[in-house]
A protein has these predicted regions:
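Non-catalytic alpha-helical coupling and interface elements of nucleotide-dependent molecular machines
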Residues: 55, 59, 90, 223-227, ...
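Glycine-rich beta-alpha junction loops
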Residues: 43, 175-177, 222-226, 230-235, ...
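Conserved dinucleotide-binding and phosphotransfer motif residues
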Residues: 32, 88, 222, 286, ...
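A conserved regulatory-domain signal marking ACT and ACT-like small-molecule sensing domains
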Residues: 239-414
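Nucleotide/pyrophosphate-binding catalytic subdomain
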Residues: 1-216, 308, 384-385, 404, ...
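Acidic-aromatic/histidine active-site loop/patch
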Residues: 219
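Short hydrophobic alpha-helical runs that function as membrane-insertion/retention elements
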Residues: 168-172, 226-228, 291, 372
């Protein structure tokens, strides 16, 4: 008898009718002889509505109280789901994060799971219940409710699968799996049957929205096989598994892009020891994450420092750096929010050289200027003007033949 953890997002449980449809689907899986744990998000739009209410009361909401408020969204979903299962004649029980024993640290609105008590869930499973758990939430050692941040229900599902040694964790969403690129940008995008944890980690960190990066990281750590599939079809989706279980690694598995980036340059900075710390420490203290960094040295002991931040942090970063520039006697601070980071990802890059240069050739052929470059063992990212997003994605997708099952080892850019 297999133990299956299934997670359904807000779109999948966005109405009473959808909750009933999900309950029917879960019951069918249960009748195949499986023990079922179902993790649910809040109904579509509910989390944003609750956060909006918090901001209507406090301009900057108290984070502990915000967690108390926002966590109620999942409580509604799991209670309605359990009722739907019972109405169909089957046993079910709904549990909140603290009832399950999902323990977290004390970082409200972005807590991390520290441990899970499996005893209570196992007891309900042994009694033949379909157990439904509120995603996205947990409890501190002091009894305070916490939430895990956006995408937290994915993390809840994988954490439960790891803690209870489930046979599989199925993440249901409104798409059929992980695609070679965004189907909304290019209709030649192909669903990937299997992808490694490392590739999925890179794609998630670079803008792919199918899986939360913390969920992928946890799945890799505990070797949890994750099946990403559609709520609305019965077709097989994408399996995220250990690289060793994939028969043949593709050269490039996917292309993703992020329009959440902004580029900042501090011009003519004194090129001397400790200057980088003076620039980036105030940024770090403000909780602003810096991504790509390049340095361009001038004659006369001066340098330009260029880096990217999230577009949502751009205004704060520019304000902070305006003061920093005065302190370090830099010439000026400039910025650009109309950029996009385009990335190619594939474990096949480990064993094949020249992938980055091929990407650069393709950009050149299309007349696209590359502003910044970042690489890792299985990823190459470039920053380009946002207006070239679709052109770049399509050109790369065609050049690496991602619409085919078997990718060529040599790429034609002529």
């Amino acid at each position: 008898m297999a133990l299956i953890v299934q997670k359904f997002g807000g779109t999948s449980v966005g109405s009473i009718e959808k909750i009933q449809a999900v309950a029917k689907r879960v019951i069918e899986k249960h009748l195949e002889g499986n023990r079922m744990i179902v993790v649910l998000s809040a109904m579509a739009g509910e989390t944003d509505r609750l956060i909006g209410m918090a901001h209507a009361i406090q301009r900057v909401p108290d984070l502990r109280e915000q967690d108390m408020l926002v966590s109620s969204g999942e409580q509604v979903s799991v209670a309605l789901f359990a009722m739907a299962v019972k109405a169909a004649g089957y046993k079910a029980v709904s549990l909140l994060g603290d009832q399950v024993g999902i323990h977290t640290d004390q970082k409200h609105t972005r807590a991390r799971i520290t441990s899970i008590d499996a005893e209570r869930i196992n007891g309900y499973l042994d009694q033949g219940n379909i157990v439904t758990v509120a995603g996205f939430q947990g409890v501190t050692d002091y009894g305070d409710i916490t939430t895990l941040g956006r995408g937290g229900s994915d993390t809840t599902a994988v954490a439960l699968a790891a803690a209870l040694q489930a046979d599989a964790c199925e993440i249901f969403t409104d798409v059929e799996g992980v695609f070679t690129t965004d189907p909304g940008v290019y209709d030649k995008a192909r669903k990937i049957d299997h992808i490694s944890y490392d590739e999925m980690l890179e794609l998630a960190s670079l803008g792919a929205k199918v899986l939360d990066i913390r969920a992928v990281s946890m799945a890799k750590r505990f070797k949890v096989p994750v099946h990403v599939r559609s709520t609305f079809t019965n077709t097989t989706g994408t399996w995220v598994v250990d690289e060793e279980k994939i028969m043949e690694s593709l050269l490039v598995s996917g292309i993703t892009y992020s329009k959440k980036e902004a580029r900042i340059t501090i011009k003519k900075v004194p090129d001397q020891p400790g200057i980088a710390a003076k620039i980036f420490l105030p940024i770090s203290d403000a909780g602003i994450m810096v991504d790509m960094i390049i340095q361009n040295t001038h004659d006369g002991g001066l340098t330009d420092m260029t880096f990217t931040v999230l577009r949502s942090d751009y205004d704060r970063a520019m304000e902070i750096l305006g003061k920093v520039a005065q302190d370090i006697r830099a010439e000026e601070v400039t910025g650009d929010q109309e950029i996009v980071k385009v990335s190619i990802v594939g474990v096949g890059m480990r064993n094949h050289s020249g992938i980055a240069s091929t990407m650069f050739q393709i950009m050149s052929k299309e007349g696209i200027n590359i502003m910044m470059i970042s690489t890792s063992e299985i990823k190459v990212s470039v920053v380009i003007a946002e207006k070239y997003t679709e052109l770049a994605v399509r050109a790369l997708h065609d050049a690496f033949a991602l619409d085919k099952d078997n990718l060529p080892l040599e790429v034609d850019v002529d």
